[in-house]
């Protein structure tokens, strides 16, 4: 059995095969997922697993150099938005590498998901609780 935090085989395989600047979307239960993009559906029930828990686990296994967030997230769901920003700051502190934060409209965010290697769907039911992670390098 795998010893590290992440034990989901699909997500683990995805992270292991990421190249520099590849993107992964982590989304709430309602975000539309393009047909041609791999869907990794973790949603079990409303709120399970949560968005932030999923972000934490994926951050623990991958090097991220940037994120894309919908502008609406900060205004409509500020508690979750601020918690995400805190997680990103902590990750940056642990790795010693900056994480660029870019905001786009929700409509542009949905279009951008089509570039993701995969979309990881959570059970989160908080509006706009979505993030696109951009892979960095560990060296």
UniProtKB/Swiss-Prot annotation:
Keyword set includes Phosphoprotein: no
Chief location category: cytoplasm
Residues the entry annotates as binding substrate: 28, 106, 128-130
Transferase found in the keyword field: no
EC number: 5.4.99.62
Pathway: Carbohydrate metabolism; D-ribose degradation; D-ribose 5-phosphate from beta-D-ribopyranose: step 1/2
GO cellular component: cytosol
Name of the top EC class for this enzyme: isomerase
Entry GO MF terms: D-ribose pyranase activity; intramolecular lyase activity; monosaccharide binding
Example GO BP: D-ribose catabolic process
Subunit details: Homodecamer.
Family: Belongs to the RbsD / FucU family. RbsD subfamily.
Protein name: D-ribose pyranase
Highest classification ranks of the organism: Bacteria, Pseudomonadati, Pseudomonadota, Gammaproteobacteria, Vibrionales
């Amino acid at each position: 059995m795998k010893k590290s935090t992440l034990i989901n085989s699909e997500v683990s395989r995805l992270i292991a095969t990421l190249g520099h600047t590849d993107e992964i979307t982590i989304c709430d239960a309602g975000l539309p997922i393009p047909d041609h993009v791999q869907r990794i559906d973790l949603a079990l029930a409303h709120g399970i697993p949560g968005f932030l828990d999923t972000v934490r686990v994926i951050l623990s296994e991958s090097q991220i150099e940037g994120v894309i967030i919908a502008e609406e997230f900060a205004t409509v769901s500020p508690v979750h938005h601020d918690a995400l920003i805190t997680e990103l700051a902590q990750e940056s502190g642990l790795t010693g590498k900056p994480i660029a934060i870019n905001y786009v409209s929700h409509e542009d965010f949905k279009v951008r998901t089509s570039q993701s290697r995969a979309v990881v769907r959570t059970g989160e039911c908080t509006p706009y609780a979505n993030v696109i992670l951009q892979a960095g390098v560990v060296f």
